[in-house]
């Protein structure tokens, strides 16, 4: 589990990884909310929305909204706001940030 302000509201949020039925699950719970946002990722190579292998590491990172591919949709840098990444050591990391347009976490890859 990692903690950090992912949505920019100044309160710590929690993110945790779990596994179910050959899927990697990421649960993100915002400070005061009871119901987490759940994002599923495949386990195994060849799938864009997946990790190549286990084990994986969940990390908080500095939020960067301007990438080589352009500005991330709905991304807003705020004081203390963090991004997340899921890394397996084999594939490019899955990068996640809070999209103020989507109203939740979204992911992208390099």
Could you tell me what each predicted segment is?
Residues 36-42, 107-109:
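Beta-propeller fold detector
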Residues 8-18, 78-85:
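Acidic/hydrophobic-patterned starts of short beta strands in beta-sheet-rich repeat architectures
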Residues 19-20, 31-32, 98-102:
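Short acidic-glycine loop/turn motifs at beta-strand connectors
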Residues 46, 50-110:
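Acidic, small-residue rich beta-repeat scaffolds with periodic aromatic anchors
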Residues 1-9, 66:
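Acidic, divalent-cation-chelating loop motifs in proteins
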Residues 9-13, 19-25, 33-35:
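Primarily extracytoplasmic ectodomains and periplasmic/lumenal surface modules that are beta-strand-rich
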Residues 22-28, 92-96:
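Structural motif
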